[in-house]
């Protein structure tokens, strides 16, 4: 079972990241809510961060944002996926999967408006990573991202990487027949059927009642890669896949083998020692900064190497 207790305690212990002050402002575009962390309006890089399944950007991701935004040339945008958090849309569903992918274009365009000269990077955690893989390989996007970070990515049942857990220990429980009917109908039937249940502990829901506990077929299809091996192989932008060594959902070794087997010259693998599926959010910032440093000029290589793993 995912260790929510550890995550909540860690989030409390961090408080406001002391590595440097970044201004935070809230924004909204086409019903999408986002929070922007930055030092100046002239940032050279902006990282757009997408949360994991059922939660929203307020679920500890501000710690990651402040860690990253301690780099003065870098801004961070935390987004609530449509149907989550403060974004509009019926909770846990969407009229069609493509709407979620189009929303990434909307946010990237908004970041281009705010930072005309900045490079734009996408970071997805868990199901947010699966969604970004779909966006980059299944949607004819109008915007261009400069790099991608997949943090403890949930690549779905077609990746073959899930741990063999008892039903009571699984975070997500799935009814298969609505997905089958939806696929056979070309997406016309049962798109709004609530086919996925997310098993948040009662204490977590008491503290965060806005978490989404059920996903429709359409929402699940938006977040879940259909052919993850082929989709990973199709990536053509600098990509870092970060695995959590103590991930409760899948083993880091299986993720590494998946990258070695299906990745390409653009895809690198990194391991976050001691991290769980959730706590990796607090441990990823140095790897992310190094990834951007290697792909593009940001800060000082020597300075970042001093912080790195």
Question: Model regions: which residues?
Answer:
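An N-terminal hydrophobic leader/cap segment in hydrolases
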Residues: 1-39
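The serine-hydrolase catalytic nucleophile loop
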Residues: 54-66
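Catalytic nucleophile-loop/oxyanion-hole region of alpha/beta-hydrolase
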Residues: 54-57, 85-111, 115-119
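Conserved alpha/beta-hydrolase
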Residues: 69-88
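Alpha/beta-hydrolase-fold enzymes
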Residues: 125-217
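Short beta-strand/loop motif that positions the catalytic acidic residue
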Residues: 235, 241-243
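Conserved alpha/beta-hydrolase "acid-adjacent" motif
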Residues: 248-254
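Catalytic histidine-centered segment of alpha/beta-hydrolase-like enzymes
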Residues: 275-285
């Amino acid at each position: 079972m995912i260790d929510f207790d550890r995550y909540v305690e860690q989030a409390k212990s961090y408080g406001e990241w002391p590595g440097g002050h970044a201004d935070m402002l809230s924004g909204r575009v086409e019903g999408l809510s986002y929070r922007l962390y930055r030092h100046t309006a002239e940032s050279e890089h902006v990282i757009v961060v997408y949360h994991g399944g059922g939660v929203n950007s307020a679920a500890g991701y501000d710690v990651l944002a402040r860690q990253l935004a301690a780099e003065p040339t870098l801004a961070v945008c935390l987004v609530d996926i449509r149907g989550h958090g403060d974004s509009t849309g019926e909770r846990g569903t969407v009229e069609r999967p493509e709407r979620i992918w189009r929303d990434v274009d909307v946010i990237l365009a908004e970041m281009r408006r705010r930072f005309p000269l900045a490079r734009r990077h996408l970071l997805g955690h868990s199901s947010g990573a699966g969604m970004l893989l779909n966006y980059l390989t299944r949607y004819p996007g109008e915007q261009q991202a400069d790099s991608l970070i997949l943090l403890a990515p949930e690549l779905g049942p077609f990746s073959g990487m899930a741990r063999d857990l008892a039903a009571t220990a699984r975070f997500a429980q799935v009814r298969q027949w609505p997905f089958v009917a939806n696929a056979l109908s070309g997406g016309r039937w049962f798109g709004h059927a609530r086919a996925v249940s997310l098993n948040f502990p009662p204490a977590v829901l008491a503290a965060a009642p806005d978490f989404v506990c059920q996903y429709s077929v359409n929402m699940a299809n938006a977040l879940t890669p259909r052919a993850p091996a082929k989709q990973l192989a199709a990536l053509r932008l600098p990509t870092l896949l970060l695995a959590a060594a103590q991930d409760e959902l899948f083993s880091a070794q299986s993720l590494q083998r998946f990258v070695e087997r299906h990745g390409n010259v653009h895809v690198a693998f990194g391991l976050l020692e001691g991290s769980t599926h959730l706590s990796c959010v607090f441990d990823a910032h140095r790897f992310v900064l190094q990834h951007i440093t290697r792909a593009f000029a940001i800060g000082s290589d020597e300075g970042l190497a001093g912080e790195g793993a």
